Design a protein with these regions (language model features):
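Hydrophobic/aromatic-rich structural module bridging two neighboring secondary-structure elements via a short loop
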Residues: 39-89, 93-99
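Polytopic alpha-helical membrane-helix bundles and their juxtamembrane interface segments
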Residues: 1-31, 35, 42, 79-87, ...
Length: 209
C-alpha cells in the first residue's frame, strides 16, 4: 500500500511502461513490424525505472534494445530467407506479408553455439555487476539480461522459439520485480509469461507450409 500512497514520477513511469508493454506484446503477437517502433520508445521509459531501482544490468539492456530495434526492423523489412537458401530453414521464402521476413523454426544447428554465447554473456554481466555496481540481485539480473539479449536476437531472426526464451525471462522477471517493488512492471511480466505460451502457438500457425 505504501507504493500507491506515495505515487510519484517513478510510479507514473512504471504505469506508462505497463501500457507500452501491452501495446508491444500485441504487436509481437500479431508479428507486426511496428513492434520495433515501440521497441525504441519503451526502453527510455523502462531504462529510467530500472536505474532508479538499482537494476543496472536491466538498464544496460535497454540500450541494447534500442540498437536491436533498428536491426530487427531492418531484418524484418528487407531480409528474406531465400538469401540463405543453402540452409534448411530457408527453403520456403514465402512470407505472410509481402517483402517481410517469414516466421521460421529455430534451427537445431544453432542451439549449442547460442547456448554457449548465452552462458558467456551471463558470466560477463554477472562479473560486471558484482565488480562495478551495488546490485542486490546480480545473479538474477545478469541471467535475465543475458537471456533477453539472446531472445531479442531470435526475435529479429523471426524464429518462433523466441517466445520460449521470453517465457523463461518473463517468469524470472516477474518474481524479481515483485521483490524490487515495481508492481506495474511485475504485473506486465506476469502477463507476458502467459502470453508467451499463446504467442508461440500463434506463430507456429503462421509458419509457411
Amino acid at each position: 500500500m505504501d507504493y500507491f500512497s506515495n505515487f510519484g514520477w517513478v510510479e507514473a513511469i512504471d504505469a506508462a511502461g505497463l501500457v507500452l508493454g501491452l501495446i508491444y506484446l500485441w504487436l509481437e503477437f500479431k508479428a507486426s513490424i511496428w513492434l520495433w517502433l515501440v521497441s525504441v520508445i519503451m526502453p527510455i521509459v523502462h531504462g529510467y525505472l530500472y536505474w532508479e531501482r538499482g537494476l543496472y544490468a536491466d538498464f544496460g539492456m535497454e540500450v541494447y534494445y534500442v540498437l536491436a530495434a533498428v536491426y530487427g526492423y531492418a531484418m524484418w523489412r528487407w531480409s528474406r530467407r531465400h538469401t540463405r537458401k543453402n540452409n534448411v530453414e530457408t527453403q520456403n521464402p514465402a512470407s505472410p506479408t509481402e517483402g517481410e521476413l517469414p516466421i521460421t523454426r529455430f534451427p537445431l544447428r544453432r542451439v549449442l553455439p547460442v547456448a554457449v554465447v548465452g552462458l558467456a554473456l551471463w558470466g560477463v554481466i554477472y562479473w560486471i555487476l558484482i565488480t562495478w555496481t551495488d546490485s542486490s540481485v546480480p545473479l538474477c539480473d545478469s541471467f535475465t539480461t543475458a537471456l533477453s539479449m539472446i531472445a531479442l536476437w531470435a526475435l529479429a531472426q523471426k524464429y518462433a522459439e523466441q517466445w520460449l526464451l521470453w517465457l523463461v525471462v518473463d517468469a524470472v522477471c516477474t518474481v524479481l520485480y515483485i521483490y524490487k517493488q515495481i508492481p506495474f512492471t511485475a504485473c506486465l511480466y506476469a502477463f507476458y509469461t502467459v502470453m508467451a505460451i499463446l504467442g508461440y502457438r500463434q506463430w507456429l500457425k503462421k509458419i509457411p507450409a
